[in-house]
Amino acid sequence: VFALEKMGMEAADKIMAVSNLTRNIVINKYGIDPSKVVAVHNAVDFDEFKQMEVKRGVDDKIVTFLGRITYQKGPEYFIEAAYKVLQKCSNVRFVMAGNGDLMNRSIRRVAKLGIADKFHFTGFLRGDDVKKMFAYSDVYIMPSVSEPFGISPLEAMKSNVPSIISKQSGVAEVLSYAIKTDFWDIDAMADAIYGLLNYPALASMSARCGVEEVNNLKWENA
């Protein structure tokens, strides 16, 4: 696959990467001439995006991971951070929404840590179920090991959900009001989650400024 990708990029007149992170990979890993590689950040068309109103059946705060449960998305770091948060506060639940090859391993790890009563696996979500999940959420987290861009944080922030993202993601280049941590730094991740859950002023500012920020991420500005 690498050889085919390299051949295609060498034959191209211009290559559009979805972030500077991806642009650097194309240049450094594939040896492509930097002058023909440009970064054009993704945007989201929110014209038909409507927030959902939901009634919650629990008083606990909800922290959500939404994505494929595979190595690239960093689910294991989410689980370890969840464990650390639950050592300090019990009125929180963690939701892993998605499916993937690390699902069973993640379930086993949650059980081994003794936090299964505070951790929920929804399986794959789409469409209105995704919007509903954001409506339930108090914090969204994307701890990706590597992410060319990442659309889900934009959707979460549009839904007024304070968000935490890994520094190893392309979307980190365009978001100032998402909290950023290294994917491997579960202490920083846990501290960020705890802060957003327990300091209303921080969560409110993050949500309010986040909505304004993603509203300005239009294709004409990409």
Regions found by a protein language model. Give the residues of each.
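Aromatic "clamp/platform" in nucleotide-sugar-dependent glycosyltransferases that forms part
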Residues: 145
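Conserved acidic donor-binding segment of nucleotide-sugar-dependent glycosyltransferases
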Residues: 178-187, 195-200
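Nucleotide-activated donor-binding/catalytic signature segment of Leloir-type glycosyltransferases, i.e.
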Residues: 107-125
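Short alpha-helical donor nucleotide-sugar binding micro-motif in glycosyltransferases
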Residues: 124-125, 132-137
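Short hydrophobic beta-strand element within catalytic cores of glycosyltransferases
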Residues: 162-165
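Conserved donor-binding/catalytic core segment of Leloir-type glycosyltransferases
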Residues: 16, 57-82, 95, 207
